[in-house]
């Protein structure tokens, strides 16, 4: 193929589309080596050197378009030198040619074989013959991308240009106002500023960025990919702290702008100081510390009314101190300046400045714990030792001291604290804790806040306590745990001391509790369990505590209330323990057999104790290997009589969380029959719930074979017979069986759903049938349903749509209620796909004023769509708004939850465009006035929020 003729090229230059098509074809020819690019340049010479400016623009555009379309590794070094020389020469051309030249240069600098020495020449020519800011916005964007690419890939060549490139870059950026271009600049310049020497131009470079601070920019709401003000501000801050030579200017700039009355300017200034503290070395910032501290002190001491400014200021101060911590001279200088201001105010907790002083004090500790903590603790110690120190003052001081210890520990400096000071503080704390040992101490009159505060200190200082102090603490802990009315949690302290001093804790605390356990009241025994069980993971105490629990659980002489406590403790123990521990206990003591025997043979066991036994059996069974689970079922299940309460609870424990791979086929029919009969005939609601859950779980886990399905079919037929006799309980049982089938994905689930939907028109069972759909759709965390069919909720939805679709059109109230229950469990995406069909049903359910549960569900579904500004609901606000206004009124059938949900939905509606809301504004604002007087505070709060939002519809934006 030959080089394109002049006629072909002239034709290509006539329109933009033809130019693009020709450039693509020429690029393919060049890639195929059909001809050389020099031949193309020669053929295109008539246009490139034409006296007609428009033709030169078109010719240059074609050449640049070809370069852009070429692979980056196609052209050779000699060809690229020739092209770069051409483009450098063209930089002198008319301004209209510049866009095409910029495109060509952009393509050239990305070519793999371009001699690296050409880069400085291209930049020199550009800076000499044109300016970036004289180009259009889109061309400036291309130029900034070029600068970004060059700074990242040609560092040595650009540094060889010395100040020429830096100066050219400064001129290119200076005056840029477009936020997208600024985003590009602020993104790549921090890396450039931190790696390139700025020479004598550091001040000029800093001023280029300083003029943008703080960012004052509001993105267009119509821009789908708008750059936010916060993003720009963050990137600008990174530029201002990118070079150590900017330190002085950055500090001055931040402090100057911190005086602004605008919140956003203050926050940006504080964040700039924070980033300066993080990025600049302490030696660079030290000369400016006094200025920074004075500025931050204004915002933190006595403190700014704005919580956001206060937190940001403390964060900046913390970063400043933490960075200086590894240079003792600088750190101590900083700390002395700050502590000199705040320490006098730590001595009086009633002073107005005490609270802000403590905040700054903790920041000092987080920065240089050994230095600051000693001085702060000593200041508190002087106050604690004063004769007029009250309990209220001690409480406040103790909580601050505990934070000082905690921060010191986090910084690894706890052991570095002055021994004399900390031991004196700890003595005072222990003395406060031991006040409970005094005979005149009346626990009923004391609020125990002092003791709680003392424990907070001891929790953090446990590693520092000496032997004498620990001995006193053990006595106090025994007194606390054995006190007949005091109940304070000190498990953190016992766990810490147990890890540090296991022998002492064993002899001075655990043994004392165990030895006297029998004589203590039930209240005290509960406290002992509470404080001993967290020590179980520590191997030194495991057996001792386990022996106590086992003895109290299985001793024949144990009273029922005490046994219940022991069973509760056993369950907590099994929850805390790992699998290996549980398996070991089972193997060593045959715990599972003991629990079953306890349930069956102990007279007078309460339902609560049986529930605890079932829970323990479940936790043990879950942790055992499948072979052992199967053996346990085979051993114990045949002998269980489900009509006995104890055996039912034991069955719950054994089967409730049995692994799904263990077959129950041999017992399946008997269990189904017994559980069904129990639920039909028992008046004990607790036993019926257990039966329902077991039925549901067993059906869910059953193996899908004809025999099992026949057994389930037999039970459902029995239930239908009972239903025909008007038995409400049979409807409930059918729903639970249906739930197990639905979740597992059995086809037979459709029959149960159909039966329930038919009952919705029954004169006496319709309510029970509607609640049956709630049972099927609701989530029950305590129910074990391990077989979960993929997308079963969607299948349930479509099944019910098929069964009830025609009936829903008639708007039977029970059909609506049942369908709302199903929608609660249906994924929102499925509802959205069917919203044209479901929308009228939702609106009708709101108008029917059903019972509270279904109303709350319907309102919740609507709210999810409205919060996302769904277009369907936008078109039906005329239906939605009146219903919500009616439901927001105080009426007997409108519970507090319904009224709040309706008002919240009305609030979310205000997110829709103003033109949609204006026709409703007056009516809604007037109607909501009644809700402002609702008897319930939470309803009134939501009403105020909703009414304010409607009142502001159409008001001018604050921006």
Swiss-Prot record:
Entry keyword annotation includes Cell cycle: yes
KW Transmembrane helix (keyword) present: no
Disruption outcome: Shows slowed larval development with lack of imaginal disks and microcephaly with deformed and underdeveloped optical lobes. Death occurs at the third larval instar stage. Reduced levels of Xpd in embryos. Results in higher proportion of neuroblasts in mitosis with shorter spindle and less dense astral microtubules with defective assembly and orientation. Loss of maternal Mms19 causes cell cycle defects in young embryos.
UniProt keyword terms in alphabetical order: Cell cycle, Cell division, Chromosome partition, Cytoplasm, Cytoskeleton, DNA damage, DNA repair, Mitosis, Nucleus, Repeat
GO cellular component, one term: spindle
InterPro entries cross-referenced by the UniProt entry: ARM-like (IPR011989), ARM-type_fold (IPR016024), MMS19 (IPR039920), MMS19_C (IPR024687), MMS19_N (IPR029240)
Family, similarity comment: Belongs to the MET18/MMS19 family.
Subunit structure: Component of the CIA complex. Interacts with Xpd and galla-2. Binds to microtubules.
Function, in words: Key component of the cytosolic iron-sulfur protein assembly (CIA) complex, a multiprotein complex that mediates the incorporation of iron-sulfur cluster into apoproteins specifically involved in DNA metabolism and genomic integrity. In the CIA complex, MMS19 acts as an adapter between early-acting CIA components and a subset of cellular target iron-sulfur proteins. Essential for diploid cell cycles, organ growth and development. Regulates mitosis by binding to Xpd and thereby competing with the Xpd-mediated repression on the Cdk-activating kinase (CAK) complex.
Protein name (database record): MMS19 nucleotide excision repair protein
Annotated gene: Mms19
């Amino acid at each position: 193929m030959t080089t394109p003729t002049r006629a072909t090229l002239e034709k290509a230059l006539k329109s933009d589309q033809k130019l693009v098509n020709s450039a693509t074809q020429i690029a393919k020819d060049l890639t195929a080596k059909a001809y050389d690019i020099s031949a193309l340049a020669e053929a295109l010479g008539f246009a490139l050197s034409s006296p007609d400016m428009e033709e030169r623009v078109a010719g240059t555009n074609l050449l640049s378009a070809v370069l852009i379309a070429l692979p980056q590794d196609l052209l050779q070094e000699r060809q690229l030198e020739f092209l770069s020389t051409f483009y450098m020469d063209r930089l002198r051309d008319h301004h209209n040619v510049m866009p095409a030249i910029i495109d060509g240069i952009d393509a050239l600098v990305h070519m793999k074989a371009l001699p690296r020495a050409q880069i400085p020449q291209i930049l020199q020519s550009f800076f000499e013959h044109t300016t970036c800011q004289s180009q259009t916005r889109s061309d400036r964007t291309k130029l900034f991308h070029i600068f970004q690419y060059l700074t990242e890939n040609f560092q040595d060549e650009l540094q060889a240009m010395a100040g020429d490139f830096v100066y050219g870059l400064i001129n290119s950026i200076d005056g840029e106002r477009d936020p997208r271009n600024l985003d590009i600049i602020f993104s790549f310049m921090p890396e450039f500023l931190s790696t390139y020497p700025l020479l004598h131009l550091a001040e000029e470079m800093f001023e280029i960025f300083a003029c943008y601070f703080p960012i004052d920019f509001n993105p267009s709401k119509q821009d789908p990919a708008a750059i936010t003000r916060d993003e720009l501000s963050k990137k600008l801050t990174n530029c201002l702290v990118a070079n150590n030579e900017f330190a002085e200017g950055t500090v001055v700039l931040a402090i100057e702008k911190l005086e602004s009355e605008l919140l956003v300017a203050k926050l940006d200034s504080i964040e700039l100081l924070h980033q300066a503290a993080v990025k600049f070395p302490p030696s660079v910032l030290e000369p400016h510390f006094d200025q920074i501290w004075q500025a931050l002190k204004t915002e933190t001491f006595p403190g700014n009314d704005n919580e956001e400014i206060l937190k940001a200021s403390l964060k900046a101060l913390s970063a400043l101190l933490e960075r200086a911590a590894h240079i003792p001279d600088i750190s101590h200088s900083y700390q002395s300046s700050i502590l000199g201001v705040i320490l006098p105010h730590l001595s009086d907790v009633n002073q107005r400045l005490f609270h802000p002083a403590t905040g700054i004090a903790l920041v000092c500790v987080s920065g240089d714990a050994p230095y600051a903590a000693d001085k702060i603790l000593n200041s508190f110690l002087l106050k604690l030792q004063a004769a007029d120190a009250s309990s209220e003052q001690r409480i406040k001081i103790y909580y601050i001291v505990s934070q000082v210890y905690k921060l010191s520990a986090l910084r690894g400096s706890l052991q570095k604290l002055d021994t004399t000071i900390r031991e004196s503080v700890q003595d005072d704390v222990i003395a406060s804790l031991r006040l409970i040992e005094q005979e005149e101490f009346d626990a009923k009159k004391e609020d125990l806040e002092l003791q709680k505060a003392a424990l907070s200190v001891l929790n953090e200082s446990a590693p520092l306590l000496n032997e004498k102090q620990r001995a006193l603490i053990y006595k106090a802990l025994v007194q606390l745990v054995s006190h007949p009315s005091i109940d304070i949690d000190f498990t953190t302290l016992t766990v810490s001391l147990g890890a540090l001093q296991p022998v002492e804790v064993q002899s001075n605390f655990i043994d004392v509790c165990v030895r006297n356990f029998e004589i203590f009241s039930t209240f005290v025994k509960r406290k002992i369990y509470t404080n001993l069980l967290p020590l179980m993971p520590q191997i030194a105490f495991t057996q001792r505590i386990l022996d106590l629990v086992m003895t109290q659980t299985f001793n024949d002489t144990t009273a029922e209330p005490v046994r219940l406590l022991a069973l509760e403790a056993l369950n907590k123990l099994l929850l805390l323990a790992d699998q290996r521990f549980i398996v070991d206990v089972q193997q060593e003591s045959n715990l599972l057999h003991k629990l079953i025997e306890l349930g069956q043979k102990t007279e007078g066991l309460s339902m609560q104790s049986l529930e605890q036994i079932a829970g323990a059996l479940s936790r043990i069974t879950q942790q055992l290997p499948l072979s052992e689970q199967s053996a346990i079922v085979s051993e114990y299940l045949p002998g269980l009589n489900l009509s006995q309460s104890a055996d039912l609870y034991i069955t719950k424990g054994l089967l409730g969380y049995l692994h799904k791979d263990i077959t129950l086929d041999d017992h399946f029919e008997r269990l189904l029959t017994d559980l069904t009969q129990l639920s039909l005939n028992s008046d004990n609601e607790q036993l019926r719930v257990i039966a329902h859950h077991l039925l549901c779980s067993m059906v869910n886990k059953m193996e899908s074979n004809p025999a099992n399905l026949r057994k389930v079919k037999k039970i459902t037929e029995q239930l239908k017979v009972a239903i025909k006799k008007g038995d409400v309980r049979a409807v409930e049982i059918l729903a639970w069986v249906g739930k197990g089938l639905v979740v597992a994905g059995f086809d037979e689930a459709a029959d149960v759903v159909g039966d329930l939907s038919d009952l919705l028109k029954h004169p006496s069972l319709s309510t029970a049938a509607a609640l049956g759909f709630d049972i099927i759709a609701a989530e029950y965390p305590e129910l074990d349903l391990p077989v979960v069919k993929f997308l079963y909720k969607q299948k349930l939805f479509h099944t019910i749509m098929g069964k009830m679709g025609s009936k829903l059109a008639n708007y039977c109230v029970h059909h609506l209620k049942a369908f709302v229950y199903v929608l609660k469990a249906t994924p929102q995406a499925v509802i959205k796909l069917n919203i044209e069909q479901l929308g009228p049903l939702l609106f009708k359910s709101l108008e029917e004023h059903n019972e509270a549960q279904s109303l709350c569900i319907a309102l919740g579904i609507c709210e999810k769509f409205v919060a996302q500004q769904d277009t369907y609901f936008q078109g039906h606000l005329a239906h939605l708004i009146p219903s919500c206004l009616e439901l927001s009124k105080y009426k007997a059938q409108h519970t507090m939850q319904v009224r709040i949900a309706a008002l919240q939905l009305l609030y979310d509606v205000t997110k829709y465009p103003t033109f949609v809301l204006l026709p409703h504004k007056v009516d809604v604002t007037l109607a909501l006035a009644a809700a402002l007087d609702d008897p319930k505070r939470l309803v009134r709060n939501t009403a105020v929020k909703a009414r304010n939002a409607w009142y502001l519809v159409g008001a001018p934006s604050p921006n």
